[in-house]
Amino acid sequence: MTTIVSVRRNNQVVIAGDGQVSLGNTVMKGNARKVRRLYHNKVLAGFAGGTADAFTLFERFEAKLEMHQGHLLKSAVELAKDWRSDKMLRKLEAMLVVADTESSLIITGNGDVVQPEYDLIAIGSGGNYAHASALALLQNTELSAEEIAEKSLTIAGDICVFTNQFKTIEKLDY
């Protein structure tokens, strides 16, 4: 699996992810990029789950963004509808975290689109560790969104065997 974390604070939104790709108990790759910029660099997206499945979802989500002129929520809901109703897509095992300057969302294979509390999202095998540490940092420090995402991903990587210390961090300032 992997860990993806998104933090929003002080006119900045960040999505960060580790780079580990595992096949069973074997590390296949340590420097995968699971966080990307989409739609003219105005949308950030990260994935946890099957890599091939996630790339399929990235492509479909980007097509939805183009169709809806970059409207994040509408694109996410339309992708979730397709994901839930299409027999081929229903078999895909991945989750997406997406964000723009206005919203941060989780899109699941069950057709859920969730806007989180505290402008904080963490998914994947190390998601609970990243979430707990990021929430503590949000509530008790003045660190930037980028610093919180980086530190919480480091903590998750120290605890979760399916999360490593290679990080991809993308941010939008607004």
Swiss-Prot record:
GO biological process: proteolysis involved in protein catabolic process
Keyword annotations of the record: Allosteric enzyme, Cytoplasm, Hydrolase, Metal-binding, Protease, Sodium, Threonine protease
GO molecular function: metal ion binding; threonine-type endopeptidase activity
Active site residues of this protein: 2
PROSITE patterns with a match to the protein in the record: PROTEASOME_BETA_2 (PS51476)
SUPFAM superfamilies reported in the protein's UniProt record: N-terminal nucleophile aminohydrolases (Ntn hydrolases) (SSF56235)
Catalytic activity of the protein: ATP-dependent cleavage of peptide bonds with broad specificity
Top-tier EC class: hydrolase
Gene Ontology annotations for the cellular component aspect, listed alphabetically: HslUV protease complex; proteasome core complex
Superkingdom classification of source: Bacteria
Family under the similarity heading: Belongs to the peptidase T1B family. HslV subfamily.
Protein name, entry field: ATP-dependent protease subunit HslV
